[in-house]
């Protein structure tokens, strides 16, 4: 089997390259590494390396700088978002505490109404006790008056009986 050679100027493949027969191996397919002998053959010029490095940097550096700037902007935006989120959380906590405060006010109104009712009851009881004390005082005064009248009545009766009892006549 023959290995095709390099294409001819008209683009048609010809036979094996010059100096190679059909059974020979093609160059580059040997058992040796493709890098062997390459280092000795190349003479590295510092200027060429520098120009290649500058070209590589000039090609990729703007994209890298834009990426770096975009990352910095994203980081700043993320910090702003975190601050905003913390503010919203604090607002939510304030709203939640406002709900607690509203519940406390509702409870305070409830207990205030209870206190008002208790105060009304106490005033009513105070009025009743005052009336009862006045009535008791009047009854006591009436009883004392009746007792005094009875005592006076007894004394009058005693005096009358004394006057009605026979008296020995005085000897004159």
Curated annotation (Swiss-Prot):
Its main location: cytoplasm. GO terms for molecular function: actin filament binding; molecular adaptor activity; protein homodimerization activity. The keyword Coiled coil applies. Residues 125-167 form a coiled coil. GO terms for cellular component: axon cytoplasm; BLOC-1 complex; cell-cell contact zone; contractile ring; cytoplasm; endosome; filamentous actin; focal adhesion. It is found in: Cytoplasm; Membrane. It is a peripheral membrane protein. The keyword Cytoplasm applies. One of its GO terms (biological process) is dentate gyrus development. Keywords: Coiled coil, Cytoplasm, Membrane. Residues 143-164 have a biased composition (Basic and acidic residues). Pfam families: Snapin_Pallidin. Residues 1-36, 135-172 are annotated as: Disordered. Belongs to the BLOC1S6 family. Component of the BLOC-1 complex, a complex that is required for normal biogenesis of lysosome-related organelles (LRO), such as platelet dense granules and melanosomes. In concert with the AP-3 complex, the BLOC-1 complex is required to target membrane protein cargos into vesicles assembled at cell bodies for delivery into neurites and nerve terminals. The BLOC-1 complex, in association with SNARE proteins, is also proposed to be involved in neurite extension. May play a role in intracellular vesicle trafficking, particularly in the vesicle-docking and fusion process. Homodimer. Octamer composed of one copy each BLOC1S1, BLOC1S2, BLOC1S3, BLOC1S4, BLOC1S5, BLOC1S6, DTNBP1/BLOC1S7 and SNAPIN/BLOC1S8. The BLOC-1 complex associates with the AP-3 protein complex and membrane protein cargos. Interacts with BLOC1S4, BLOC1S5, DTNBP1/BLOC1S7, F-actin. Component of the biogenesis of lysosome-related organelles complex 1 (BLOC-1) composed of BLOC1S1, BLOC1S2, BLOC1S3, BLOC1S4, BLOC1S5, BLOC1S6, DTNBP1/BLOC1S7 and SNAPIN/BLOC1S8. Interacts with SNAP25, SNAP47 and STX12. This is Biogenesis of lysosome-related organelles complex 1 subunit 6. It comes from Bos taurus (Bovine). The lineage of its organism: Eukaryota, Metazoa, Chordata, Craniata, Vertebrata.
């Amino acid at each position: 089997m023959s290995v095709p050679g390099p294409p001819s100027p008209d683009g048609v493949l010809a036979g094996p390259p010059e100096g190679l027969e059909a059974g020979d191996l093609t160059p580059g397919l040997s058992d040796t590494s493709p890098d062997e002998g390459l280092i000795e053959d190349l003479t590295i010029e510092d200027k060429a390396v520098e120009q290649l490095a500058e070209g590589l940097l000039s090609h990729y550096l703007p994209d890298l700088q834009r990426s770096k700037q975009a990352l910095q902007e994203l980081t700043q935006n993320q910090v702003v978002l975190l601050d905003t989120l913390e503010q919203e959380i604090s607002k939510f906590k304030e709203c939640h505490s406002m709900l607690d405060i509203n519940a406390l006010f509702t409870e305070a109104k409830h207990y205030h109404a209870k206190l008002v009712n208790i105060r009304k009851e106490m005033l009513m009881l105070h009025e009743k006790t005052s009336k009862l004390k006045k009535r008791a005082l009047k009854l006591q005064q009436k009883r004392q008056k009746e007792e005094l009248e009875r005592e006076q009545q007894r004394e009058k009766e005693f005096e009358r009986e004394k006057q009605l009892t026979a008296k020995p006549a005085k000897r004159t």
